[in-house]
């Protein structure tokens, strides 16, 4: 059972209590924490759209601590990040692996960061399918298309050549915050506010 801290604020009408995530959302901070899956993606997309409707000129901050997860769920978040008007500041706290790293890199150029002890990992998409040979072939072709799309987007966001991205994502590729900065996944390593 997880406990979510509450924040109590004084207002002109008395006290108002919020869970900590709702309070931070008021400050345009979204937490992307845990496995990237459909339910989480729907919540993140809804928060992004809400914050855009509140003020399309103010940056939105996404704090990422994720081992990765579903490609389709992650692409729903990514496409929304690219679609909406506000700039997206991404910050890796803890880890940004697989789809988490992809979303970290997908923040607005110049506004992507990692904390000093954060870890980032990129790799090719994982797939597994059982069934008839013809269905396995269809799924294999689909995962190759997804791999090409992810590599193309990573090349765009990092400035690396597509050949380098293909080589570097062939296996799990772990990086420190400084290595992620040198690679182009983030723009800076934050040490102090």
UniProtKB/Swiss-Prot annotation:
What's the chief localization of this chain? cytoplasm
One of its GO biological process terms is:
protein quality control for misfolded or incompletely synthesized proteins
Gene Ontology molecular function: any one: ATPase binding
Keywords attached to this Swiss-Prot or TrEMBL record, sorted alphabetically, are: Cytoplasm, Hydrolase, Protease, Serine protease
Q: Name one Pfam family in it.
A: CLP_protease
Give the UniProt subcellular location, in the record's own words: Cytoplasm
The terms describing its cellular component in GO are: cytoplasm; endopeptidase Clp complex
Q: Where is the signal peptide?
A: none
EC nos: 3.4.21.92
Q: Return the similarity comment.
A: Belongs to the peptidase S14 family.
Q: What is the name of this protein?
A: ATP-dependent Clp protease proteolytic subunit
Write down the species: Haemophilus influenzae (strain ATCC 51907 / DSM 11121 / KW20 / Rd)
């Amino acid at each position: 059972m997880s406990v979510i801290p509450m924040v109590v604020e004084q207002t002109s009408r008395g006290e108002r209590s919020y869970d900590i995530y709702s309070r931070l959302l008021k400050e345009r901070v979204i937490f992307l924490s845990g496995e990237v899956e459909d339910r989480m993606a729907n919540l993140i997309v809804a928060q992004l759209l809400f914050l855009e409707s509140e003020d399309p000129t103010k940056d939105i901050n996404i704090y990422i601590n994720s081992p990765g997860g579903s490609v389709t769920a992650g692409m729903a978040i990514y496409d929304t990040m690219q679609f909406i008007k506000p700039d997206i500041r991404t910050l890796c706290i803890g880890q940004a692996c697989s789809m988490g790293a992809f979303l970290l890199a997908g923040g607005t150029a110049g506004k992507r960061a990692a904390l000093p002890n954060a870890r980032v990992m990129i790799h090719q998409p994982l797939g597994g399918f059982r069934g008839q040979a013809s269905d396995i072939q269809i799924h294999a072709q689909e995962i190759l298309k997804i791999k090409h799309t992810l590599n193309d987007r990573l090349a765009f966001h990092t400035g690396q050549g597509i050949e380098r991205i293909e080589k570097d994502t062939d296996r799990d590729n772990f990086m420190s915050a400084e290595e992620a900065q040198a690679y182009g996944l983030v723009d800076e390593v934050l040490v102090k506010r």
